[in-house]
Amino acid sequence: MKIISFGDIHEDTSNLIKIMPELETADLIVLSGDLTNCHGKAETKKVLDAVKKYNKHLLVQYGNMDIPEVDRYLSTEGINLHGNGYLVGDVGIFGCGGSSPTPFHTPSEISETDIEQFLTHGFNKVQDATWKIMVCHTPPKDTATDIIRNGMHAGSQTVRDF
């Protein structure tokens, strides 16, 4: 199975052409969040339509820079990974969008308790899968992936522990 996952598009789909062959032959595309820059449904739809030109098999979640409307829109489209789990063959994919609180006060920050609840809910849907993939927009705390420009760690302890 070929799964391609990426995030932080922030409405810029110009680089999709660079990975067109990979996108076209993937079994699944996973978008991990930050589809927009503090925008909603209309901008999200543009991003999704751009990806769907290459592959219609998508699972998507919102990021901390997407407004909550994006989360609701993805649910109406039946592709929302946030707090959800999907079986794709023998692979279970579950996720949590948004982010733990940051110094930037972005539109979609959620508590560590909520992150745990969303991850648990999604995991429970795929717990019997042979293989499991956890997709989180917020990185695990105190790792190389959660360091912000001032050197501070801004990731989630819950993601790290899970």
Model-derived segments and spans:
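Broad hydrophobic/π-residue packing in well-ordered secondary structure
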Residues: 59-60, 92-93, 161
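Core catalytic region of metal-dependent phosphoesterases/phosphodiesterases
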Residues: 6-88
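Conserved catalytic scaffold of divalent metal-dependent phosphoesterases
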Residues: 11, 66-158
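Extreme N-terminal starter segment of soluble prokaryotic enzymes
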Residues: 1-4
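A general structural detector for well-ordered alpha-helical segments in enzyme core domains, enriched
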Residues: 19, 46-50, 118, 155-162
